[in-house]
A protein has these predicted regions:
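Conserved N-terminal entry element of GNAT/NAT acetyltransferase domains
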Residues: 1-17, 159-160
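Conserved GNAT-fold acetyl-CoA-binding loop/helix
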Residues: 19, 23-48
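A short helix-loop-beta-strand connector motif used in the catalytic cores of GNAT acetyltransferases and
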Residues: 48-60, 89
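Conserved beta-strand in the GNAT
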Residues: 60, 68-77
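Conserved acetyl-CoA pyrophosphate-binding loop and the N-cap/start of the following alpha-helix
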Residues: 99-111
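Conserved active-site alpha-helix within GNAT-family acetyltransferase domains
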Residues: 106, 130-149, 153
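Conserved GNAT acetyl-CoA-binding A-motif
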Residues: 117-127
Length: 160
């Protein structure tokens, strides 16, 4: 796959008939992050994406209209009390290895940027591993790195 022009891609909403191709992409993403339960996670995320009451959405990149997706962007709104506004959190961004370097990521991010502009969500925010050099090179070209530090506070299992 040698497409390099982001405008040559079709980026649209994930559809129910995309399940199998999406699942391959999602498992690739989970493998990259060394998930220990990929099948269970993939099933839950698919249910969220197909449930209109959930906020999580997915844009996919296709090399041509109607073709199976080769990239995904899971995203959702989040409120910003400090600013009194709504922004977009990009939870997952993944492109199949054979489609990397072809403009698919640029196309996904451009489509997400347009969607967020249309909805009044500002900015689009995401995190990545410090060691993810290839992705960070793209992100550094398209976005601004913040000085925010991310923390996770474990909460443990639910009380009986």
């Amino acid at each position: 796959m040698t497409v390099r022009d982001p405008g040559a891609w079709t980026v649209d909403e994930l559809r129910p008939d995309d399940h199998d191709a999406w699942a391959v992409l999602h498992r690739g993403y989970l493998d990259f992050y060394e998930s220990t339960r990929p099948d269970q996670v993939t099933a839950v995320v698919w249910q969220w994406l197909m449930d209109p009451t959930q906020e999580l959405e997915c844009l996919v990149a296709r090399p041509a209209p109607g073709a199976p997706p080769v990239g995904l962007a899971h995203h959702r709104p989040f409120v910003r009390p400090l600013h009194g506004s709504v922004a977009c959190f990009l939870d997952d961004l993944y492109v199949a290895p054979q489609a990397r370097g072809t403009g698919a990521v640029d196309a996904l991010l451009a489509a997400l940027q347009t969607r967020c502009r249309d909805r009044g969500w500002e900015p689009v925010r995401w995190v990545t591993r410090e060691s993810n050099a290839r992705a960070r090179a793209v992100y550094d070209r398209l976005a601004h790195r913040t000085d925010l530090v991310t923390y996770d506070l474990p909460v443990g299992p639910p009380a009986p």
